[in-house]
Amino acid sequence: MIPSHEHADPGAVSRSGADGGQEVRRDAGPARGLFIVFEGGDGAGKTTQVNLLCTALQQRGHDVLTTREPGDTWLGGQIRHLVLSPDSGEISPKAEALLYNADKAQHLAEVVRPALEQGRIVVSDRYVDSTIAYQGAGRALSVDEVARLAGWATDGLVPDLTVLLDVDPVTAAERMDNRDRMESAGDEFHRRVRDNFLELARRGGGRYLVVPAQLTAEQ
């Protein structure tokens, strides 16, 4: 059985960060639903797998909300355009991290928490780990500092299950056309992102399911 966030300890919760530090998370508070997140590099097939899972759950009678980060609120849509559009020019790594976490805070307040409190299953395409991997490891910022910022933005809400779709950057690049600003960041950037995702999964224990994403969607 997947452990529920509503049984979190009432005090602070911490786990090891990707570079050996501690990622501190405050209590997530009561919630009745189930929170599932898909993570992975660009080109891993997250959107396809999110849709397949949601269809399967709905066919079994579950009330499912599909969402994504960034961009699933009005504010998030503005932020998504800023951080992904090649026309945005040079954005400093710290500014980028702050923008992604602003999206995250609004997304949790407006979309995720209300749905969980209604008892719904929330399936999100990206969440905190993407911010740690991309804006932390990818942009060579402190992973622990980015993790703490994301924990503050989300009030420490931890998914019940994180599905990490793992694909090597070369294979992922072959799948992508019309690349956005993040997808065009370069091979070394995407290698750091992948390595950090795998490190987060290794340290995160039973909450993670790592799935090789070199396969087709049906496999």
Walk through the language-model features, giving the residues of each.
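Conserved lysine of the Walker
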Residues: 46
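Hydrophobic positions on the alpha1 helix immediately C-terminal to the Walker A/P-loop
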Residues: 49
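Walker A (P-loop) phosphate-binding loop of P-loop NTPases
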Residues: 43
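A glycine- and Lys/Arg-enriched "phosphate-lid" helix/loop adjacent to the NTP-binding pocket
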Residues: 126, 130-196
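NTP-dependent small-molecule kinase module
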Residues: 1-29, 52-54, 170-219
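ATP-dependent small-molecule kinase phosphotransfer cores
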Residues: 62-154
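Walker A (P-loop) ATP-phosphate-binding motif of ABC ATPase nucleotide-binding domains
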Residues: 35
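Hydrophobic anchor at the beta1->P-loop junction of P-loop NTPases
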Residues: 38
